[in-house]
């Protein structure tokens, strides 16, 4: 699902909000979440999951075209850990489809 598809679904489901209002709310939420992670903070949405940063240590990688070794610097990467309610819901829907 893309951001525009999410906006469409919310507008259709909600009915009271315009697509511009929903678009602004989603863009604002994503921007605030990005800023929060950029400063090293953790985001927790109970029942859904949490976003945090994980550190990837420096390592030696390979250039896939040449096979040459390349030194990769350490970096922080965003990490999402689903909450129990989200995991349970996903597993319920998987079992219903099987």
From Swiss-Prot:
SUPFAM superfamilies: IHF-like DNA-binding proteins (SSF47729)
Keyword DNA-binding: yes
Xref: PROSITE patterns: HISTONE_LIKE
Keywords, in A-Z order: DNA recombination, DNA-binding, Transcription, Transcription regulation, Translation regulation
Pfam families (alphabetical): Bac_DNA_binding (PF00216)
Single Gene Ontology MF annotation: structural constituent of chromatin
GO cellular component terms attached to this protein's record: chromosome; cytosol
Similarity comment: family membership: Belongs to the bacterial histone-like protein family.
Role noted for this protein: This protein is one of the two subunits of integration host factor, a specific DNA-binding protein that functions in genetic recombination as well as in transcriptional and translational control.
Record protein name field: Integration host factor subunit beta
Species this protein is from: Pseudomonas putida (strain ATCC 700007 / DSM 6899 / JCM 31910 / BCRC 17059 / LMG 24140 / F1)
């Amino acid at each position: 699902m893309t951001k525009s598809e999410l906006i469409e679904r919310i507008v259709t489901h909600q009915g009271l909000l315009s697509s511009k209002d929903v678009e602004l709310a989603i863009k604002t939420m994503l921007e605030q979440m990005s800023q929060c992670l950029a400063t090293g903070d953790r985001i927790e949405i109970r029942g859904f999951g949490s976003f945090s940063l994980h550190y990837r240590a420096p390592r030696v990688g390979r250039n896939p075209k040449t096979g040459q070794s390349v030194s990769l610097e350490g970096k922080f990467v965003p990490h999402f850990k689903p909450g129990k309610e989200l995991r349970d819901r996903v597993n319920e829907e998987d079992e219903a489809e099987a």
